[in-house]
């Protein structure tokens, strides 16, 4: 379709991510943490729709509970693209929110990345991939990964990305009944920030960990309980700063069986890895 004809982009995927491991290896003078992590994309996530406006207004067609428009990453992403390009067009944005908030699955960051990618297309602003990635970093450390659009080994504050070739896999993701503020975990005095850096060739789930997990579990025991429950079936750990935990399983049948046995106090989903972001072809 000629982009000149576009007035609407519907059901644009904003996939979840897993941190297969997450090491905190230092802290910059400006307070940002230096990380090493392996990002993995999943076939499960939010979906966003964008309707072109000619009055320059960016409006949410759906509210996000507890989040004002000024603090909504989707709205901020749209306005950032407007400001950066001088675009006078606007958009009505609808978010079908499927990922749990405060879960460590990158939902807000993924929504922001999809907004930048989709509106760059809808508005025909012509921002190239590297510039779009730099804009994403201004919104959050995880946003560049979703614009990068494939499994990655990440360093720096999460913005130094290298492709990571991983075999396909099935996962079970479990959400305990808590929401974890990322800032709280990274600001914790007990968080260790001196893990020895590893090389990309050394990456293996058996020799890595999530440095944020112990802090999150001490403050939110429900996370530790969810890990213990899931670990009955396969090695389990937390993703991101929590609260969701995950385990890799052998097959879709195994994933479905575990999800079906999930206690009522938790929510559980099956998810499959994907080779690349569904919108990667839109990033120039």
Curated annotation (Swiss-Prot):
The keyword Ribonucleoprotein does not apply. The active site is at 17, 142. Disulfide bonds: none annotated. Catalyzes the phosphorylation of the position 2 hydroxy group of 4-diphosphocytidyl-2C-methyl-D-erythritol. The gene is ispE. It comes from Aromatoleum aromaticum (strain DSM 19018 / LMG 30748 / EbN1). GO terms for biological process: isopentenyl diphosphate biosynthetic process, methylerythritol 4-phosphate pathway; terpenoid biosynthetic process. Pfam families: GHMP_kinases_C, GHMP_kinases_N. Signal peptide: none annotated. ATP binds at residues 100-110. It catalyses: 4-CDP-2-C-methyl-D-erythritol + ATP = 4-CDP-2-C-methyl-D-erythritol 2-phosphate + ADP + H(+). Pathway: Isoprenoid biosynthesis; isopentenyl diphosphate biosynthesis via DXP pathway; isopentenyl diphosphate from 1-deoxy-D-xylulose 5-phosphate: step 3/6. Its EC number is 2.7.1.148. SUPFAM superfamilies: GHMP Kinase, C-terminal domain, Ribosomal protein S5 domain 2-like. The lineage of its organism: Bacteria, Pseudomonadati, Pseudomonadota, Betaproteobacteria, Rhodocyclales. This is 4-diphosphocytidyl-2-C-methyl-D-erythritol kinase. Belongs to the GHMP kinase family. IspE subfamily. Keywords: ATP-binding, Isoprene biosynthesis, Kinase, Nucleotide-binding, Transferase. GO terms for molecular function: 4-(cytidine 5'-diphospho)-2-C-methyl-D-erythritol kinase activity; ATP binding.
């Amino acid at each position: 379709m000629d982009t000149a004809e576009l007035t609407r982009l519907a059901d644009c995927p904003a996939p979840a991510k897993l941190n297969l491991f997450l090491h905190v290896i230092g802290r910059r003078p400006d307070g940002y943490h230096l990380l090493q992590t392996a990002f993995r994309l999943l076939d499960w996530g939010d979906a966003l729709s964008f309707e072109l406006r000619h009055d320059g207004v960016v409006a949410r067609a759906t509210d996000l509970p507890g989040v004002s428009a000024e603090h909504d990453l989707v709205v901020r992403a749209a306005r950032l693209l407007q400001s950066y390009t001088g675009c006078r067009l606007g958009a009505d944005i609808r978010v079908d929110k499927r990922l749990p908030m405060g879960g460590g699955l990158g939902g807000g960051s993924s929504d922001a990345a999809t907004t930048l990618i989709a509106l760059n297309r809808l508005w025909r602003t012509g921002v190239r991939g590297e510039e779009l990635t730099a804009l994403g970093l201004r919104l959050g450390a995880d946003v560049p990964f979703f614009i990068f659009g494939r499994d990655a080994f990440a360093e720096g504050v999460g913005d130094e990305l290298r492709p990571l070739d991983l075999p396909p896999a099935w996962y079970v993701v479990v959400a305990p009944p808590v929401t974890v503020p990322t800032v709280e975990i990274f600001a914790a005095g007990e968080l260790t920030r001196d893990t020895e850096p590893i090389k990309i060739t050394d990456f293996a789930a058996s020799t890595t960990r999530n440095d944020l997990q112990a802090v999150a579990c001490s403050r939110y025991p429900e996370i530790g309980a969810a890990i213990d429950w899931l670990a009955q079936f396969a090695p389990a750990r937390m993703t991101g700063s929590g609260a969701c935990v995950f385990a890799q399983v052998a097959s879709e049948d195994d994933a479905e069986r575990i999800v079906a046995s999930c206690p009522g106090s938790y929510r559980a989903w099956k998810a499959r890895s994907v080779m690349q972001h569904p919108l990667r072809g839109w990033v120039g």
